[in-house]
Swiss-Prot record:
Mg(2+) binds at D18. It comes from Methylibium petroleiphilum (strain ATCC BAA-1232 / LMG 22953 / PM1). It comes from the Bacteria. The lineage of its organism: Bacteria, Pseudomonadati, Pseudomonadota, Betaproteobacteria, Burkholderiales. The gene is metK. This is S-adenosylmethionine synthase. Residues 100-110 are annotated as: Flexible loop. Its cofactor is Mg(2+); K(+). It is an enzyme of class 2 (transferase).
Length: 393
């Protein structure tokens, strides 16, 4: 990639229909794990106007009121009025869960290459990434895109901007100079709102636009990056119909929002609703943990990790490190350090990151990475000193 360029990432709010589905799936996972952390869960959710469908595979000894969990999640998000297209009190909730296939379970319970270990729940490839663009070691465009929609929800819920409704999207286009963030070229923020905020179908009131820029955008973005920045606020105009009424929502359809905003490749597997024997989730968390510790150790300015697994096999097929020329030692040496310092077998990941806990609903909106939440063990940098010492730095 050239040293001077524009790069864009987007995020969506907790009220976006796909994120409603993700949060319901992870709320159900948490409710199950609170009773039986050894459960196998693959909880999928569909949301539409006045309707929630829960489907997937669950094997558990827990007794969970799935319908109530779905309603409670919708209420927390803010869909509490029939005018919004879905209302937690009156929406229909259909439940269609089955048990995990015995054919899958036998390979997960006992790995073919290590009978004392857990096999991967499926084949696949996962990526982790970290860079020094923000203190959280995340790419700046996705980090700030998340913070914009997070603030939209905050001001909606605390009543400071009472005309806001739950659905919203953000997009940040960053200008890079010499490969580093220099300024923000464009900010797009589209938010659902009450009907009185538009002058016409295609034009918002000036007071609405001003409130979004002054109360949501400017308090979040670094002032020094706002140099001739363009602001596009509800650029299509009126946005009253939104959420599951505006679009059908599905679990696992915002995988780039969930990760790095396109700054690195994605293996294709979604996270929400999956217990950590599913390496789509747990190995992606572990790869972030590895990459973040390498950057925190000062061994690279940016670091991409790829791991891959075969179903029923514990050990990863590969551990590949790519630092795009920013590493202080060769990438193959970093890969050997990773293999020495991190147990990337599924059971090792679960133990290393303490993943058999009801911690997942919080991950399902505003990004799984780059948030200093106490439950997010994959954001720790506790291996940085050991990696630095092992690298002789």
């Amino acid at each position: 990639m050239a040293n001077d360029f524009l790069f864009t990432s987007e995020s969506v709010s907790e009220g976006h229909p796909d994120k409603v589905a993700d949060q319901i799936s992870d709320a159900i996972l948490d409710a199950i794990f609170a009773q039986d952390p050894r459960s196998r869960v693959a909880a999928e959710t569909l949301t539409n106007t006045g309707l929630v469908v829960l489907a997937g595979e669950i094997t558990t000894n827990a007794h969970v009121d799935y319908i109530q969990v779905a309603r409670d999640t919708i209420k927390r998000i803010g869909y509490d009025n029939t005018e919004y297209g879905i209302d937690y009190k009156g929406c229909a909730v259909l439940v269609a869960y089955d048990k995990q296939s015995n054919d899958i379970a036998q390979g997960v319970d006992q790995a073919s290459d290590d009978h004392l270990n857990t096999g991967a729940g499926d084949q696949g490839l996962m990526f982790g990434y970290a860079c020094d663009e923000t203190p959280e070691l995340m790419p700046a465009p996705i980090y700030y895109a998340h913070r914009l929609v997070e603030r939209q929800a905050q001001l909606r819920k605390d009543g400071r901007l009472p005309f806001l409704r739950p659905d919203a999207k953000s997009q940040v286009t960053m200008r890079y100079v010499d490969g580093k963030p220099h300024s923000i070229d464009t900010v797009v923020l589209s938010t659902q709102h009450s009907p009185d905020q538009s002058e016409t179908a295609k034009k918002m009131k000036a007071s609405f636009t001003e409130a979004i820029i002054e109360e949501i955008i400017k308090p979040v973005l670094p002032k020094e990056w706002l140099k001739d920045t363009k602001y596009l606020i509800n650029p299509t105009g009126r946005f009253v119909i939104g959420g599951p009424q505006g679009d059908c929502g599905l679990t696992g359809r915002k995988i780039i929002v969930d990760t790095y905003g396109g700054a690195c490749p994605h293996g294709g597997g979604a996270f929400s609703g999956k217990d950590p024997t599913k390496v789509d989730r747990s190995a992606a968390y572990a790869a972030r943990y590895v990459a973040k510790n390498i950057v925190a150790a000062g061994l690279a300015r940016q670091c991409q990790i790829q791991v891959a697994y075969a179903i029923g096999v514990a050990r990863p097929m590969n551990i590949t490190v790519y630092t795009e020329g920013t590493g202080v030692i060769p990438d193959d040496q970093l890969a050997r350090l990773v293999a020495e310092h991190f147990d990337l077998r599924p059971k090792g990941i679960i133990q290393m990151l303490d993943l058999l806990r009801p911690i997942y609903e919080k991950t399902a909106a505003y990004g799984h990475f780059g948030r200093e939440e106490p439950e997010f063990s994959w954001e720790k940098t506790d291996k940085a000193n050991a990696l630095r010492a092992a690298a002789g730095r």
